[in-house]
Structures are given as C-alpha cells and as structure tokens.
C-alpha cells in the first residue's frame, strides 16, 4: 500500500511538472476562437441602425431587429450584442481594434479574405503564395503543430471548424492531432454518445444556402465543447463561420443574431473552464477574426477582399492570468494579425518559430 501511495505521488508530481510554463507564466492552456468576418464596427459600436433601416426590407423583421439590438447609447448597443465580451473580457482582459479610439489592428496580407487571413493568424506571417480559398495544403508551419511537438502538448492540441478548408489550412496530411471541420465526421478513437450522434447528423444535413463546405456553427460548437470536456486539450482552436455567411447574403438581422449567439457559445466555454481545476486561473482565451468588411457608406458592409476599402481592419480580445485587465484599449501602438501566433506560444512558455520570420509578441497582452 505504501509503494502504491509513493507511485501516485510521483505520478502527480510529473503531471504537475509537465503542465508547468517554461517561462514561469501562469498560462498552461490556450483557447483560440475566431468569428469569421465579424466587423470591428459591430464589436465596438453595436448594431448599425442605417443598415437595419435600409437593408432589411421585411417590416416585421426590421422592427424585431431594432427591438432586439438597437439602443441610442453606443455602450448599451455593444453590451447587448456581445454581453460576455463587454461584461467579462472587458472587465478582466483587453480588447483591441476600436479605430475611433486610436486602437488599430490590421492584416498584413493584401487579400482580406479567409484562407490568407487564417494563414496569417496561425502561421504568423503573410505568404504571397497563399492567395485563394482553394483547397491547397498549406506548406507553412502553424502554431498548433509547433505546440503539438512540445513537452506536455503532444496529442493535447485540437482544432474544430465550420469551414472544411481548415483541413487544408492546418494541413491534416502533415499533422496527426485532431482537426475536424465542415461535413467531415469526427474520427477520434474515443467518442461520447453526443459526438457519435453528431457524426451521423452532420452528414445528413442539406446545408442549404451555405454549400457543402460549411456546417452549422451549432454543430462545430457541440463537437468542440464535447471534445474539451472529454479530452482536456491544452491548446484548442475553434473557428466559427456563420457570421460571414449571413454578411455575404446581406442578412443583417441574422448576422447580428449569430454574433450574439457566438458570444453565448464563448461564455459557456469560459464558464465551464472556471469550474475545473485544470483550466481555472491557468487558461488564456483569445477571440479574433480572419478579415474585416467594408462600411455602410460605400455600400459594402457585407463584402470583403482586396477591392473593398477598410476590409483589412480587424479586432482581438484576450483574457487570462497573465494579461493585465486594461479593458478596451485606446491610443495603442498598431498591432497585426501576424502577431497572434507568437503571442500564443509565448503565453504557453515558448518562442514561436515557423518556416519564415514571424510577427512579434504583443507585449501589452502579457504582464
């Protein structure tokens, strides 16, 4: 019995050591979440009454949207749209990207659409050869696979995405950690009953309006949340997509509603983590996007791409034990999407390296 007790103590000590941060920081886990194509305007200014009044033709839907999301006060609008972001992250973390207050975040790639944006975010630099949304395996080393090779992270890294192109962006042929996207079923050895049900359900959906390359964010959320509970990853990436789909269709009411729902998804994940010792006070959450969109004045609020003015401007939010609670950032140095990968690795205790030089760590995000 004494020998067994000794073994348990040694094992517990090894477990604690394997999760310790090489830089002495408190962060042991990271959750990265992206909301595809969500404009900085809605994040910081809330719903735009001009788009509601002039874009929503159905009177009933227009009135319902005004009632749900429009308030005269700017802070009330944004708090109502994204309550977790503005009540929790803003009080204990940092939010970047409000151009009206001197906080600018932008892409370094010149394309302003998804694959180049996600490449920049995950690998830490712009690659001129990544210039389409085609299903081409990404040759660049990303921060997920970088961390998957570190002590204590092997098979503790995972990615879930609504858009199936992530299998190519993250490169599932080169990497063996869990990557699940689009209408592809989750093929892990260990599955919960809900994940088995999702596997059957995801292949039966018609995906009207999206095409077969995008699944509902509700499915992505349930896949990822179940994986989090079962597998306890140390680095989890979740990429939601429906915000971009509704914006392209210029369905502003649905666009606002999905932003509100995604905020609730993020809140549920954060709340769950606070009730578990592995994650509580040891986890950094980062929320950002892959590209911006045009503005109302130009008539391009639903569009993005090289030809769309201001589609390069994005935003980011962060909360965790190593991040000062400065709230909404104002009059800051300009930051870029290419800096997020190095910042994530640094928070986990490592100096990120890829196959090319990468963006620098956002020092303001770390104490």
State where each predicted segment sits:
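Metal-dependent active-site segment of extracytoplasmic phospho-/sulfohydrolases and closely related
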Residues: 31-32, 40, 262-302, 344
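Non-catalytic, well-ordered alpha-helical segments in soluble enzyme domains
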Residues: 148-151, 322, 331-366
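Active-site His/acidic residue clusters
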Residues: 172-173, 222-268
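Long, well-ordered early-domain segments
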Residues: 69-168
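Histidine-centered active-site microenvironments of extracellular/periplasmic hydrolases
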Residues: 54, 288-319
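Acidic, His- and aromatic-enriched active-site or binding-groove loops in soluble protein domains
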Residues: 123-136, 176-210
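Active-site-proximal N-terminal segment of extracellular/periplasmic enzymes that hydrolyze or transfer
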Residues: 20-94
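Bacterial Sec-dependent N-terminal signal peptides
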Residues: 1-25
